[in-house]
A protein has these predicted regions:
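ABC ATP-binding cassette signature C-motif
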Residues: 1-155
Length: 155
């Protein structure tokens, strides 16, 4: 379903009409991050609004990346750190996406990182599409509409 929404595949029947908007897909591997870059370099890559260096570092700090973390390779980050960095990068980018699609965002996150993710999502004012089995998390981010998919089992 995500690939249909993003336009990566077309439906076998019917038509999907997509508005001209910017969507960001945050998969379980955080593939928007470049593992060859260091934390600060990654944040700088998202700097479309030409924030000054100190402003980027303030944002990194607000997502719990201290000065000691700025030279750490993105490939060495834990799942929670990768999620925090990606959320930080989205706040650095001047062109906030119209839609953010999360695929199982709480997988491999500890309680502190789930709280940071929840706070960031609750501040976001645009459209969210969240694929998740974590009902507690979905309640905390005040999902307005749900689509529940169940697999049919045949015997």
């Amino acid at each position: 379903m995500i690939k249909l929404i993003l336009g990566d595949i077309e439906p076998q029947t019917g038509t999907i009409y997509r508005a001209d908007n910017k969507a960001v897909y945050i998969d379980q591997d955080y593939s928007l991050l470049d593992n060859k870059l260091k934390v600060y370099e990654q944040a700088q890559q998202f700097n479309g609004s030409s924030l000054q260096e100190h402003e980027i570092k303030i944002r990194l700090n607000s997502f719990l990346f201290t000065k000691d973390d700025w030279d750490k390779s993105c490939s060495a980050l834990s799942g929670g750190e990768r999620m925090r960095l990606l959320l930080c990068c989205l706040t650095i980018n001047s062109k906030s996406p119209d839609i953010i699609i999360f695929d199982e965002p709480t997988n491999n996150l500890d309680i502190q990182n789930v709280e940071i993710l929840t706070a960031a999502i609750n501040e976001y004012q645009e459209t969210l599409i969240v694929v998740s089995h974590d009902e507690t998390f979905l309640e905390q981010i005040n999902i307005e509409r749900t689509i529940e998919l169940r697999q049919k089992y045949s015997r």
